[in-house]
Amino acid sequence: MRYTHILIETRFDEPNSVVSHMTEDVTLAVGGIAPEFEAFLSDGSKFVLSEALSSGKGVILYFYPRDNTPGCTSQACDFRDNFGRISDGSWKVVGVSTDSAKSHQNFISKHELPFDLIVDEEAELHSLYGTWREKSMYGKTYMGTVRSTFAISSDGTLAWVGYKVKTKG
């Protein structure tokens, strides 16, 4: 199941109050406009896509299933190991998973990650970007994260889109 359009209403005076409305299927594509969003980082600060892009740098937004699992750790460490090359250019790296802020903080500390992680426990941002989809394992279906990466240019357009990306590990 893929989601095309999500309206997210969040009251910042009540951080856990989120209402989302999902409609038809769609997958984001290169050349399209990246969906605008506001979300909380693991340190409790707010990340606003348009504000991040206003710095003149693009944003590499990557979605991964779970902190401290082999594939996700490999992916995060690959971004870490290439961070100087990426961030010295024109990009800011931001990871997203449905893990808690505490889990993210431990993950960042344990692997010395030099970039921010967004807390998306209810998968609203995942749904907005089409990365929260029906999956199956051993004959059972469930909703989960499809490992995906989006390179968002400073003008807000999608310069690169990768669904079902593979990790080195």
Residue positions per predicted region:
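Chalcogenol-based redox active-site neighborhoods
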Residues: 3, 12, 18-169
